[in-house]
Curated annotation (Swiss-Prot):
InterPro entries: K+_transporter, K_trans_C, K_trans_N, Kup. This is Probable potassium transport system protein Kup. Transport of potassium into the cell. Likely operates as a K(+):H(+) symporter. GO terms for molecular function: potassium ion transmembrane transporter activity; symporter activity. GO terms for cellular component: plasma membrane. HAMAP family: Kup. Pfam families: K_trans, K_trans_C. The keyword Ion transport applies. Disulfide bonds: none annotated. Coiled coil: none annotated. Keywords: Cell inner membrane, Cell membrane, Ion transport, Membrane, Potassium, Potassium transport, Symport, Transmembrane, Transmembrane helix, Transport. The gene is kup. The keyword Ribonucleoprotein does not apply. It comes from Burkholderia pseudomallei (strain K96243).
Length: 630
């Protein structure tokens, strides 16, 4: 095949990935025009709809998109990939790699990363609610007589969206890209039409209008910044979803279609307001002629459902990562596609999200009310991403500290400005994502600290495995036929389940395997590096299986690899799995306060069973109980 053909194939693949990325990565930021400008001129802000104010706000929107999306995320942050993977937890793992595990900065970076992940969930409960609701509210423009149905229709759409998650979205997901391409083209065309009617709006490209607006209104302009940030919701997704599509397709989509379409639509809305300030009632839907209003409502609703789907899938992926990294208790994870590894479904997360989202929709009643709650989670994550990226630039890339200070300084001024403006909205609704994030942060840190204490207690009371096996082989117990697998969290200590088995049954299987799963700080582990097998003699094997934080441990696959390496055969239904069922007992020993220990014990008790998490046949499991005082 010629170089020209290879180049053509690569180009086709790049374009295909870019279209797919448009359907997943850009849904949230792509549906922001539904409510962003309307919220910026909310009556609560008291900004007059004068030409200078309109030009000033549009200029702010334009430069926010250019500086934060086009430069910060696309050019800089997306360089900080963890073996191709992005997102706040992946960035945290990358930033921790060169640091001393016991240093204070390590603890600070870990806490920042976890808090950033928690704030994502605060965002994840608002995005579907405000997106779908703002789209359905287009009925108030298209068919005012149906305005009383906005809330019921929103609720039905959201319930249906979460109901289908169990069955996966691989099939309909193929349509997401083309639909979102149609969406971006549509909003661009609507914008161009009105820009042509009021070309004066193009002058908002000049940052003079943004600075003039800020200096003229000062305090009110700072409040408006809290609404301007709504145009950036979803910017973090460019980085978080990088592992699915790669940096090049996302950059191509951002620069060629997404950013130009967004800018054209916002400028079109600004032009409409210059022509008719009363259009602030709903500037997005009033861009369309009356005959196109209803089709636009339908397209908007589909686009917001796609945007919501991306956030929901992101919540599943983030939960899976957090479980593997040890910040969240084990949960049942189902794979909804045999072909796409990333297509997963986490039932607990799904139904909790739906419950909270429905409460939000019913409680806030309109997208206008909900807009006050939106933004604070986004800006908090933006600040955290900037700080973690700075650590990576200095510690991992070894960039000049002065250069990093200059780059990060500019980004932090912007991020902290937006974050501070959103703090002003805490009373109006900003408390919601902050409260959700704070609660989750407490639970995740409690779980992480509790697991650390459990490991310390277990290690202190544990028996080293190597000398124990030597003694066991020197004075062997009665051997019985079959295979026994002891799952253990520490491959240097004797599994408690083995001690109990020897104590009560006084037998050892002919083939005994000690299996440990280890999660590394990279997203994926190469297949040939995954499983190591140590032959301890006389049918005893120590198996270590390493997985990345984006992968789910698979006992069956590990056994197949052990069989391949050692020339064995395994029959899963003829194999016994021995597990230690730990019962955590809160005490006044040093570690955590007693009330936090009780919270940890409750989380430990309600974690998914190892049989569910590791997909082990329940009828092949022997559980032996043990108490651990913390």
């Amino acid at each position: 095949m010629t170089d020209t053909n290879h180049s053509s194939m690569r180009q086709h693949s790049l374009q295909s990935l870019a279209i797919a990325a448009i359907g997943v990565v850009f849904g949230d930021i792509g549906t922001s025009p539904l409510y962003s400008l309307k919220e910026a001129f909310s009556p609560a802000h008291g900004i007059p709809l004068t030409p200078s104010a309109i030009l000033g706000v549009i200029s702010l929107l334009f430069w926010a998109i250019i500086l934060v999306v086009g430069i910060k995320y696309v050019l800089f942050v997306m360089r900080a990939d963890n073996n191709g993977e992005g997102g706040v937890l992946a960035l945290m793992a990358l930033s921790l790699r060169p640091l001393n595990p016991k240093s204070r900065i390590t603890g600070l970076m870990m806490a920042l990363g976890i808090f950033g992940a928690c704030m994502f969930y605060g965002d994840a409960v608002i995005t579907p609610a405000i997106s779908v609701m703002s789209a359905v509210e287009g009925l108030e423009v298209a068919t005012p007589q149906l305005s009383h149905l906005v809330l019921p229709i929103t609720i039905v759409i959201l319930i249906a969206l979460f109901w289908i998650q169990r069955h996966g979205t691989a099939t309909v997901g193929k349509l997401f890209g083309p639909i979102m391409v149609l969406w971006f083209v549509t909003i661009a065309v609507l914008g161009i039409y009105h820009i042509a009617r009021a070309p004066m709006i193009v002058s908002a490209i000049n940052p003079y209008y943004a600075f003039s607006f800020m200096s003229e209104h000062v305090l009110l302009a700072y409040v408006v910044l809290g609404s301007v940030v709504l145009v950036l919701t979803g910017a973090e997704a460019l980085y978080a979803d990088m592992g699915h599509f790669g940096a090049k397709p996302i950059r191509l989509a951002a620069y060629v279609l997404v950013m130009p379409s967004l800018v054209l639509n916002y400028f079109g809305q600004g032009a409409l307001l210059l022509l008719d300030p009363k259009a602030i009632e709903n500037p997005f839907f009033l861009l369309a002629p009356q005959w196109a209003a209803l089709p636009l409502v339908v397209l908007s609703t589909v686009a917001t459902v796609i945007a919501s789907q991306a956030v929901i899938s992101g919540a599943y992926s983030l939960t899976s990562q957090a479980i593997q990294l040890g910040y969240v208790p084990r949960m049942k994870i189902l794979h909804t596609s045999e072909l796409a590894i990333g297509q997963i479904y986490v039932p607990v997360v799904n139904w909790l999200l739906l419950f909270v989202i429905l409460c939000i929709v019913i409680g806030f009643k309109s997208s206008d009310n909900l807009a006050a709650a939106y933004g604070i989670a986004v800006t908090a994550t933006m600040v955290i991403t900037t700080i973690l990226a700075a650590v990576v630039m200095v510690k991992v890339w070894n960039w000049n500290k002065l250069l990093v200070a200059m780059i990060i300084g500019v980004f932090l001024v912007i991020d902290l400005g937006f974050f501070g403006a959103n703090l002003l909205k805490v009373e109006q609704g900003g408390w919601l994502p902050l409260g959700i994030g704070a609660l989750l942060f407490f639970l995740l840190m409690t779980w992480y600290k509790g697991r650390h204490i459990v490991k310390e207690r277990t290690a202190a009371d544990g028996i080293p495995l190597a000398p124990f096996l030597q003694g066991l082989l020197a004075h062997p117990p009665h051997r019985v036929s079959g295979t026994a697998i002891y799952l253990t969290g520490n491959d240097t200590l004797v599994p408690v389940s083995l001690l109990h088995n020897l104590k009560h049954n006084k037998v050892l299987h002919e083939r005994t395997i000690f299996m440990t799963f280890v999660t590394r700080d990279i997203p994926y582990v190469k297949d040939h590096e995954r499983v190591t097998v140590h032959d301890a003699g006389e049918g005893l094997y120590i198996v270590k299986a390493e997985y990345g934080f984006n992968e789910t441990p698979d006992v069956k696959a590990v056994l197949e690899e052990v069989a391949r390496q050692r020339g064995m055969t395994f029959e899963l239904m003829d194999t016994s799995f021995f597990l230690a069922r730990e019962t955590v007992v809160p005490t006044h020993l040093p570690g955590m306060s007693i009330w936090r220990e009780r919270v940890f014990a409750w989380m430990h008790q309600n974690a998914a069973k190892p049989t569910d998490f590791f997909a082990i046949p329940a009828n092949r499991v022997v559980e032996l109980g043990t108490k651990i005082e913390i």
